[in-house]
Amino acid sequence: PINLFYAYSFSQMIYTADEINQSSGFISSVSFRMHQSYCVRNLSVYLQNTNKESFTNDRDYVQVSSGDLVFDGDVNLSELVNGWFTIKLNEPFKYDGGNLLVCLDDNTGDYEDEIYFYHYPASEDIRRTISSYTDYFDLTWENAENGDYSFNPTSKGYYINPQIKFDMIIGDELPVIAVK
């Protein structure tokens, strides 16, 4: 989901409704499984319900906006629980039961040793993860897609997806708790 070997990275992943296997709910956190790391990264996380099932090429980015932003801040990757690091969202995200776009923008500006994330094969011919990375400038979906800099970011498409977990409140309404 992020490339720690570069100062900046921008990735989008599509998880299908069949993979998530929930009709709807509110996502309160997102977790990724990885090898041990001892660094802190500055991340922006975006979630978006989508009809999109795959990416057509290495720069087929989906437009994301501030309305899709669910987390913005530092994440300590050394705080693993059974190999997973968790990002608690600022507000629960309303998942509609369809495909889900997960977007991670690493704004750290510094690189670490290359750390590997666990993944699974999506399909031999379906690109479900795309990622761009560079040492020269902060990436957004626009400049990752267009490559409009003199130092073009490296962009790749993958036929795999990072292993992910969602903490989810099931149902169409957030619970309301009354305190007297």
What are these regions (language model features)?
Residues 1-54, 107-175:
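Beta-sheet-rich sandwich/jelly-roll-like modules and their strand-loop junctions
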Residues 22, 42-125:
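Aromatic- and Gly/Pro-enriched, solvent-exposed loop/edge beta-strand patches characteristic
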